[in-house]
């Protein structure tokens, strides 16, 4: 389970409540079938990895891994076995006799994860553990932590993992299920696929995905029995499926939502459902371009493969182009509740 959201949404506070580091104001905290409200952190069967991993500088990697087990008075042979097992999983075998100052950032973070593994907890709690690493190391560690979770499952000693991050890439690539939070409230708990394709509200729709979803105010207008989106001074008819989902909402203020990859752009009008805008700027991502169109009083982002975009871009900016939406991928949100009324 990954908890994701912007800074200040209470995701780390939620994790600390699970760990027993933060007092809850009401309700129950359960780990498995056990209510743990009144249990100290060490009695909850959890292991936590923080953003600042704080290894003991005067101890070797081996000693850092073993320290918590020694405090619990575990037999020496068992400590050695569990340290060696964790070192093997995280590929730390060659580093066991090094001091923290002799480690790279990624290696030090693996040791911090190893200290959690050796405890063999019921629950792993990760609080933004990769925030201090550069982009390349973050990608590598994401894979390692995901692989660790799978290995523990296969070993017959599975542990629930709760992972907190503000990075949606980490959330989408690591989570079996993701909890999206805003200002202390849960906005949606779902699979990565459902969060992306079936967001329950405008916040989730705009938070998940990069570049973010185009979400703009619109009116649903009736055109000879078929509803259409009002876009500037033009309209774009809904698909039959979308029409059936939102029929009856014509009188409401609404927003449409469309991801940039479901916006098509052309120099010529499309056969059906075409609107126009001004091509104002582009961003070259190598294999694709982000094309920004000025439509009425806002910008619309389109994500277009390079071979399609290049001929249009070569004709220059600040000129009229045409666009249409894949209406089977379009969302309609109620302006008052911000809920998705099209799923």
Residue ranges and their predicted role:
Residues 19:
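Helix-to-loop junction immediately C-terminal to a conserved catalytic motif
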Residues 12-15, 111:
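ABC ATPase nucleotide-binding domain helices that frame the ATP-binding cleft
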Residues 25-28, 78, 183, 330:
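Conserved coupling/switch loops of ABC nucleotide-binding domains, chiefly the family-specific signature
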Residues 4-6:
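The feature captures the beta-strand-to-loop junction immediately N-terminal to the Walker
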Residues 27-35:
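Conserved ABC transporter NBD signature motif
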Residues 213, 223-343:
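Non-catalytic connector elements of ABC transporters
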Residues 44-45, 55-203:
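ABC ATPase nucleotide-binding domains
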């Amino acid at each position: 389970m990954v908890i994701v959201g912007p800074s200040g949404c209470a995701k780390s506070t939620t994790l600390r409540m699970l760990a027993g580091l933060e007092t809850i104001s009401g309700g129950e905290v359960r780990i498995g079938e056990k209510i743990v409200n009144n249990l100290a952190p060490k009695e909850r069967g959890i292991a936590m990895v923080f953003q600042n991993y704080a290894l003991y500088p005067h101890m070797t990697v081996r000693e850092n891994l073993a320290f918590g087990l020694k405090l619990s008075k575990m037999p020496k042979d068992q400590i050695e076995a569990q340290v060696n097992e964790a070192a093997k999983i995280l590929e730390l075998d060659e580093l066991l006799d090094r001091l923290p100052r002799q480690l790279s950032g990624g290696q030090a973070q693996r040791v911090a994860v190893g200290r959690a593994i050796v405890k063999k907890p019921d629950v792993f709690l990760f609080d933004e553990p990769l925030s201090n690493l550069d982009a390349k190391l973050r990608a590598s560690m994401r894979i390692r932590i995901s692989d660790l979770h799978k290995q523990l499952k296969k070993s017959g000693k599975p542990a629930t993992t709760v992972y907190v991050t503000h990075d949606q890439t980490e959330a989408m690539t690591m989570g079996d299920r993701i909890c999206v939070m805003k200002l202390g409230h849960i906005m949606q708990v779902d699979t990565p696929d459902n969060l992306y394709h079936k967001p329950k509200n405008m916040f989730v729709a705009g938070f998940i995905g990069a570049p973010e979803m185009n979400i703009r105010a619109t009116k649903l207008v009736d055109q000879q029995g078929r509803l259409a989106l009002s876009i500037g001074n033009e309209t774009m008819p809904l698909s039959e499926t979308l029409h059936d989902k939102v029929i009856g909402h014509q009188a409401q203020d609404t927003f449409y939502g469309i991801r940039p990859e479901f916006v098509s752009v052309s120099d010529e009008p499309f056969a059906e459902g075409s609107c126009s805008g001004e091509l104002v700027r582009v961003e070259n991502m190598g294999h694709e371009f982000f094309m920004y169109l000025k439509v009425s009083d806002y910008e619309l982002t389109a994500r277009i493969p390079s071979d399609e975009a290049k001929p249009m871009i070569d004709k220059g900016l600040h000129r009229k182009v045409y666009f249409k939406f894949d209406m089977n991928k379009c969302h309609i949100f109620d302006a008052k509740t911000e809920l998705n009324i099209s799923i």
